[in-house]
Amino acid sequence: MGYSADIISTDASTNFMNDELFIKAYDEVKKTDTRGYLGSQDIRWRIHTIVWAAKVAENIEGDFVDCGGGFGYFMSSIYEYLNFSSLDKTYYMFDSFSGQDTRYGDINHFESFGDWYQDVLDNHDNKQNLKILKGYLPDKLNDVTIDNISFLSVDLNSVNPEIGCLNILWDKISKGGIIILDDYGFPGCSNQREAHDTFFKSKNRLVYTCPTGQGIVIK
């Protein structure tokens, strides 16, 4: 069948896209796009990576932590794919819900979307085991106690906050826990990639580069 979208083009099998559970999970992603950020973009392969990682992490001790949950695309797909509300785990979704923290010299590319915190609360008020936490990272991590992590998504579009989160959370990640770095291999994100490479080299880990631009690390 082949696939050409979201920075990749491949003739590899896309059979996973026909899976009924995956279709339902991706439908949840589209429902979450209330501000139109995703629009007509096709991120199915990226979501495939997310739900694969979540499925692995389901059987590892620890909670799910989403640093830069944005509009809730990853979270909503995971909730549907794993029936997360039935699990003995908590999903922590952190975001400013208004874009990048300009203290680090970043341009806020999400400024035109305003503050979407209430949108996320309203869209996901029926989900069990979900904690939606508003604030800039890594500072906001100090407001909660998380003992063990099996799944960590890092998508802050900014070097310093991402490395700050990893410094705080690394020791809490269980053996075999999965880390997804959303921007790792994307064009224009070399500063993030280089910083992540340095961090994970210090932990004797190698980041796997996905054709989607995501990076994957297993602790």
Q: Predicted regions: what is each one?
A:
Residues 45-49:
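N-terminal pre-P-loop "Q-motif" helix
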Residues 8, 13-41, 51, 58-219:
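S-adenosylmethionine/decaboxylated-SAM
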